């Protein structure tokens, strides 16, 4: 899900692309993280390379208003770690993000799990995520989203460094991880089944096979 951002000209001092948002604009979507019923999933903010569709590195990010300034510590997942705070919404500071100068990066708002998946992952472990992801997508979509939001049928798992590998199902089947991504429907695993991952995930997103490409 893409939003809009103000793109400022690349600065010869920072050698980066700079994006600017108002905090209140981001808070409108992120406040869904505080609602009950989303115990295992959240909304995350990322930047995605418009050409390669891979995550952009965030070189620096901060918010400021008048004499107040706070820089964010960017995690390995490349997520923008914004705090969710009503007082900040009222103060409405500006949020700045620097990404590499040689890439055009689009603002990306996603529904994802709060914790990575790793090792052996069971059908029963994944099943409770489906309604939570569905609910969060519909909350983001607004009042009538339930009419048009595709059904979440599994998970899209993303791995670091554009990993090429495979996941192994407990029934002996395998599925390729290509450029760090693999999509798995819950029905492919089956009740009582498991999948084995080669390394921990970086992001786990909904799998929406009925969504328009």
Regions found by a protein language model. Name each.
Residues 10-11:
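N-terminal signal peptide c-region/cleavage motif recognized by signal peptidases
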Residues 14-90:
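N-terminal Sec/ER secretory leader and immediately downstream segment
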Residues 35-39, 87-91, 149-151, 159, ...:
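Solvent-exposed loop and beta-edge segments used for protein-protein assembly and interaction
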Residues 71-77, 108-110, 170, 177:
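Short amphipathic beta-strand/extended segments with alternating polar/hydrophobic composition
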Residues 82-101, 184-200:
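Noncatalytic modules at the cell exterior or secretory-pathway interfaces
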Residues 91-149:
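Surface-exposed beta-loop interaction hotspot
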Residues 136-213:
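Glycine-rich, aromatic-bearing surface loops/beta-hairpins
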């Amino acid at each position: 899900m893409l939003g809009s951002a103000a793109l400022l000209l690349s600065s010869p001092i920072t050698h980066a692309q700079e994006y600017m948002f108002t905090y209140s604009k981001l808070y409108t979507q992120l406040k869904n993280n505080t609602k009950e019923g989303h115990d295992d999933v959240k909304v995350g903010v990322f930047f995605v390379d418009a050409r390669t569709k891979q995550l952009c590195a965030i070189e620096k990010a901060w918010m400021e208003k008048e004499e107040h300034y706070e820089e964010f510590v960017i995690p390995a997942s490349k997520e923008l770690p914004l705090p969710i705070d009503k007082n900040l919404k009222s103060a409405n500071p500006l949020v700045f993000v620097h990404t590499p100068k040689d890439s055009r990066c689009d603002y990306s708002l996603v529904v994802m799990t709060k914790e990575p998946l790793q090792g052996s992952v069971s059908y029963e472990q994944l099943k409770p995520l489906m309604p939570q992801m569905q609910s969060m997508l519909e909350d983001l979509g607004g009042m009538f989203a339930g009419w048009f939001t595709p059904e979440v049928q599994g998970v899209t798992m993303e791995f670091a460094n554009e990993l090429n590998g495979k996941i192994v199902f407990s029934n002996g089947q395998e599925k390729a991880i290509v450029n760090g991504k693999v999509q798995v429907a819950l029905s492919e695993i089956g009740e009582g089944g498991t999948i084995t991952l080669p390394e921990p995930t970086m992001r786990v997103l909904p799998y929406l096979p009925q969504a328009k490409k």
